[in-house]
């Protein structure tokens, strides 16, 4: 089994953690943007079937 030889420095750990957080933030922004465009009806990539409740 592979074992790391030295301890990872705090700065390197912080950099990796921030990269990981930024990826999540970007995914959340995309999801929010897609949700907004679907709710307003301005989405060009999705077709939402409208149901008439009358």
UniProtKB/Swiss-Prot annotation:
Major place of residence: plastid
Keywords (A to Z) from UniProt: Chloroplast, Plastid, Ribonucleoprotein, Ribosomal protein
Protein's UniProt keywords contain Ribosomal protein: yes
Parts forming coiled coils: none
Molecular function per GO: structural constituent of ribosome
Single GO cellular component term: chloroplast
SUPFAM superfamilies in alphabetical order: Zn-binding ribosomal proteins
Any Pfam family the entry gives: Ribosomal_L32p
Record has RNA-binding as a keyword: no
Domain of life: Eukaryota
GO biological process: translation
Subcellular location: Plastid, Chloroplast
Similarity comment text for this entry: Belongs to the bacterial ribosomal protein bL32 family.
Record's protein name: Large ribosomal subunit protein bL32c
Organism: Helianthus annuus
